Amino acid sequence: MFEALIYDSDEQGWLRFTGASSIHVAKTSDDVAVVLDTIEAACSEGKYAVGYVSFEAASAFDSALVHHPAGSLPLAAFAIFDHAEEASPGGMEPGSEPLELAPVIGESSFGDSIQQIKSYLRSGDSYQVNFTHRLKGKTAASPGSIFSFLCRAQPSPYSAFIETDDYAICSVSPELFFEVNGASIR
């Protein structure tokens, strides 16, 4: 199973994707380009591709880029769909189950990372850094309920919910990482 609910900021509405015709997963850096070529071909045929490329896939694009181990999630995963349905996230009502999250990174490692980032900025190795870290927690809430809660707490033009048999991704990003439109990448 690979289903998705995506906010279309151009149309100001939600699109639901179910019944994937195929699913493409990259578990190694070498697999990432193959997956991206496959979805590009499908999109050129008028199909929809929904998925993600993780930050941990960086070395697939430039071997000089350092990344943390990917863990159990694929480096990239996309599903191909023949159509999308207009939808709303209304079917996913927030539950009353508590969600307590704690950072996986320790305070000392966090401080060391911030100092390293400042060093990169001062030396000109980077002009911008998006420092992220994982949070871990337990809840009885469904992934859909968590996504609904996040959408209400932080409305975003780039919200996406992906649910598979093995994991769910709830994203309420305020920014677009990249977009491909014909021969243009922005």
What are these regions (language model features)?
Residues 1-186:
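Extended alpha-helical targeting/anchoring segments
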